[in-house]
Every structure is written in structure tokens, then in C-alpha cells.
């Protein structure tokens, strides 16, 4: 992976969270894990203070994006966004929100202009950004807004990935009651189409196999435990199959995620947030990767939050970020192959 022509653009994330910690730790493990070249978009001073606090010997180099790959072997390249991040680890401060936002904006600009191969995002704290006037529901929605063309915002799809399992929740950050209300055949189909397209183009799976989970216990048990699986999920499966997609379902969710079952599909399409995230976080808590499908560029992220309680302590585990960097490089290579 280290022979990639273009580096990955890594965002700063919430400066008071563990983003700086794991960025530094990942660079130190670059040879051990064969990491692709990456550069961090943000404030070199923030990283320098973090490295000193953690007692890490990480040489930093402020460079232009086009020079980052060459600098990566001996230094952690930092591309300035012009925003200073002064937050203290573990003490989020709205004054650093512009630095987090600018990092995301510059990363998207770099990948869309061809300076970077993909975007990898460190965790943000939405509550902190809201204090600074951020009006998007979350990271993914902001990325979709930045990706719009001709006024059209793409439909982003969240996939959680590890080597043993890939899952996609059709409904995401809403209550269970609202998830049931929002779930429609059209939404399931449009989500699955995006999954199939990106699995083909970005992960090199020629004929993706989808397993669609039922909403209700036992996938509704022929209507005895609810009508949604017969009325909403099954028609979506039928439409996908008519389009040539290898899709099965609705399947009882409680038997979809054991080892033998996982070998029968490439991605599980789940109906709500916890149905998707509980199995993957059980299987790969430290190595899960959040992938946003449906965007005109590749975006991955570690599957965890800002972890303010351990920021600056040296306890943050970089495994999920390392996995996110490696998956982004894999997807970029597949797309250019």
C-alpha cells in the first residue's frame, strides 16, 4: 500500500478528543501495519502539544498536499487549513470548532481536486460544533452537502465494515419508533442499489450478495408478529432480484450473524441502527470502520467517538483508525484499477 501515488487526507476531528492521539499513534505504526501515506489537515501546533503530552517522538512537517507522500516515510505530514486549534485534551471548547470544520472542508476539496486519494475522518463532537453554528445533523450529512453537484445532494449510506462482516442500516440516527415510520420499500431499494454499486466499484466484488434482515422478530413469522416484513421488506427484495441483484430476505435477524451465516453474503442490509451495529461491534469492537457509500469520493472513519475521558492519556487505541486508513487505500486502489 505504501506505493500509492496519492496520499490519504486525514482530518483533525475534534481537537480535544482522541483524534490527534490516534493520528500520532497510527503514524508510529506505519511500517508495522504497512500503512499508505497520509497527511493530517489541521494545526501542527495542536499535534505538537499532543505529542509532547503523550511523550511521543513524532517529527512533524508542514507541507503542501502534493508533497505529503514523499514526506510520509520520515515525518507526519501536516497540511495547514489556516485555523488554530487551542483546545485542551478532554476539555472540548467551541472556539476550536472552526478548526474541525475547516479540516473536513479542506479534505473534501483535496480529494475532489485530485490531490488526495480518499478522505479519512477523525471523530467530531456534534454538540461542540452546534455551539459554533454548525447546522448539519452529523458528519455524514455535512460531507454529502460538500459533495453536491448542480444543487443535488447525494444520498449517503453508512456501512460498517470489518474483515468478517459488513452491515448497512437503512435508517440511522432516529428513535426506533421513527425508524419504523421512516422505513419504506423505496428507501430499502435505493439504499441497496448504492451498496451494490459501491461494493462493485470500490471493493471489487463483481456480484455482491445482499442479506436483508427482517424488521420484526423471526422476520414477522408470516405476519403473526407484524406486517412490515411482508408489506415493506419483501417487496424490496423482489424489486432488487428483478434488477439482477443477488438479494435474500427478509431473514430473521437473530440468525444472520453467526460465522456460518456470514459466509453466505457480502453485506447485511439492516432495518435500523442497533440491528446493524450490535453485531459488528461485538465481532470487531476495536477494528470496525465506518464507510460512507454514495458519495463521489471515498470516505472512511474509525468506528468510535471522541472519547474525551481518555484524550491525552495515552490510552487511545489507534486500531480502528489504522483499519480505516487501510480500507480507504484498498478502495482507492480498486477504483483506479
UniProtKB/Swiss-Prot annotation:
GO cellular component entries: cytoplasm
Chief place of localization: cytoplasm
Catalyzed chemical reaction(s): 4-(phosphooxy)-L-threonine + NAD(+) = 3-amino-2-oxopropyl phosphate + CO2 + NADH
Cofactor annotation: Zn(2+); Mg(2+); Co(2+)
Binding site for substrate: 139-140, 281, 290, 299
Keywords: Cobalt, Cytoplasm, Magnesium, Metal-binding, NAD, NADP, Oxidoreductase, Pyridoxine biosynthesis, Zinc
Amino-acid positions noted as binding a divalent metal cation in the UniProt annotation, renumbered to this chain: 173, 218, 273
Pathway: Cofactor biosynthesis; pyridoxine 5'-phosphate biosynthesis; pyridoxine 5'-phosphate from D-erythrose 4-phosphate: step 4/5
InterPro entries, per the entry: PdxA, PdxA_fam
GO molecular function, a single term: NAD binding
Origin superkingdom: Bacteria
EC number: 1.1.1.262
Subcellular location as annotated: Cytoplasm
Cofactor, how bound (note): Binds 1 divalent metal cation per subunit. Can use ions such as Zn(2+), Mg(2+) or Co(2+).
GO terms for biological process, alphabetical: pyridoxal phosphate biosynthetic process; pyridoxine biosynthetic process
Function: Catalyzes the NAD(P)-dependent oxidation of 4-(phosphooxy)-L-threonine (HTP) into 2-amino-3-oxo-4-(phosphooxy)butyric acid which spontaneously decarboxylates to form 3-amino-2-oxopropyl phosphate (AHAP).
Further remarks about this protein from its record: The active site is located at the dimer interface.
Subunit composition and interactions: Homodimer.
Full protein name: 4-hydroxythreonine-4-phosphate dehydrogenase
Source organism (scientific name): Rhodopseudomonas palustris (strain TIE-1)
Lineage per the UniProt record: Bacteria, Pseudomonadati, Pseudomonadota, Alphaproteobacteria, Hyphomicrobiales
Amino acid at each position: 500500500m505504501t506505493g500509492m501515488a496519492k496520499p490519504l487526507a486525514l482530518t483533525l476531528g475534534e481537537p480535544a478528543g482522541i483524534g490527534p492521539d490516534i493520528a500520532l499513534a497510527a503514524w508510529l505504526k506505519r511500517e508495522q501495519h504497512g500503512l499508505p501515506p497520509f497527511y493530517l489537515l489541521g494545526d501542527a501546533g495542536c499535534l505538537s502539544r499532543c505529542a509532547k503530552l503523550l511523550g511521543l517522538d513524532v517529527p512533524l512537517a508542514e507541507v503542501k498536499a502534493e508533497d505529503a507522500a514523499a514526506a510520509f516515510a520520515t515525518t507526519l505530514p501536516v497540511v495547514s487549513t489556516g485555523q488554530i486549534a487551542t483546545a485542551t485534551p478532554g476539555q472540548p471548547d467551541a472556539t476550536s470548532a472552526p478548526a474541525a470544520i475547516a479540516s473536513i472542508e479542506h479534505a473534501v476539496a483535496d480529494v475532489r481536486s485530485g490531490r488526495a486519494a480518499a478522505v479519512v475522518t477523525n471523530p467530531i463532537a456534534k454538540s461542540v460544533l452546534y455551539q459554533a453554528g454548525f447546522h448539519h445533523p452529523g458528519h455524514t450529512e455535512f460531507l454529502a452537502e460538500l459533495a453536491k453537484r448542480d444543487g443535488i445532494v447525494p444520498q449517503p449510506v453508512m456501512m460498517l465494515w470489518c474483515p468478517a462482516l459488513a452491515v448497512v442500516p437503512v435508517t440511522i440516527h432516529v428513535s426506533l419508533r421513527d425508524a419504523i415510520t421512516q422505513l419504506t420499500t423505496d428507501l430499502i431499494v435505493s439504499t441497496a442499489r448504492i451498496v451494490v454499486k459501491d461494493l462493485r466499484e470500490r471493493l471489487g466484488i463483481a456480484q455482491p450478495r445482499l442479506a436483508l434482515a427482517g424488521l420484526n422478530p423471526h422476520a414477522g413469522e408470516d405476519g403473526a408478529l407484524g406486517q412490515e416484513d411482508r408489506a415493506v421488506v419483501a417487496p424490496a427484495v423482489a424489486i432488487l432480484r428483478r434488477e439482477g441483484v443477488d438479494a435474500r430476505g427478509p431473514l430473521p435477524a437473530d440468525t444472520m450473524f453467526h460465522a456460518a451465516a456470514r459466509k453466505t453474503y457480502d453485506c447485511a442490509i439492516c432495518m435500523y441502527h442497533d440491528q446493524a451495529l450490535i453485531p459488528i461491534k461485538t465481532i470487531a469492537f476495536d477494528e470496525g470502520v465506518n464507510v460512507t457509500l454514495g458519495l463521489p469520493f471515498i470516505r472512511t472513519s474509525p468506528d468510535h467517538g471522541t472519547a474525551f475521558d481518555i484524550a491525552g492519556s495515552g490510552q487511545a487505541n489507534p486500531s480502528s483508525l489504522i483499519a480505516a486508513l487501510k480500507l480507504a487505500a484498498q478502495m482507492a486502489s480498486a477504483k483506479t484499477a
